[in-house]
Structure formats: structure tokens, C-alpha cells
Amino acid sequence: MRLPNKYALTFPERRPTPVRPLALEEIRRLDFAEPEFRRFPCLTLALESGRRGGLRPAVFNAANETAVKAFLEGRVRFTAIPRVIDRTLRAWDKTPVQDGRTLASILAADAWGRDAARRMMEKEKP
């Protein structure tokens, strides 16, 4: 994970790294483990949104991007991110429009999610 983390921390630049590129042909075995849902609550929210479908994944993504941006700007704590997403999704679940197969409906859900997440963050303290 060093290389993806480095890319995330130095984006949009690409800085040199002493880490060797991954050579899949050298790996003899890959081990997979159950996700740690308690440790990563946003994973639970993402999977639940995908299972429910409709426009909920678009709202999840919008709330996530908005909350992460606020964290990176120092406006909310890291631990606020899942709370903001969860509260945004709960508010979305109460709206009458839950499905849409057009680009316009997806963009509207995205805008709704961003606006709702911003309102949720007004209640959060950095």
C-alpha cells in the first residue's frame, strides 16, 4: 500500500519513490481476509448503498467526496466522515425520489448529496 498511499498524498504530482513496482509474477500466493467493517465504517455504507441501488450510490459518492474534501481542508475531523455520509444517506432515504436511470437524475442526486453533506457538516466541529 505504500505506492498507492504515496500517489494519494502527493496528487496531482508524481514524485520518485524508492519502492519497487509490484511484480505479480514474483508473488507465490495471495491471501484475502474478511473486511474489518467496524474499523472501516465507510465500507459498510458503500456496500449497503450498492445493494440498495437506485440513486443511493451516487448520493454516497457525493457525500463521501464532500466530507473527505472538508477533512483535507481541516474543516471536520477524520472521524466525522462516516457520520456525515451516514446522516446524508439517512436523509436521502426519506426523499421521494429513489430511482433514476437518466444522467440528469444521477447528476441531481449527486448535487443533492453534496448539498446535504455540507449541511450535515455545519453541525460538525473540526
What is the predicted role of each segment?
Residues 1-126:
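Catalytic, metal-anchored helix/loop core of enzyme active sites in primary metabolism
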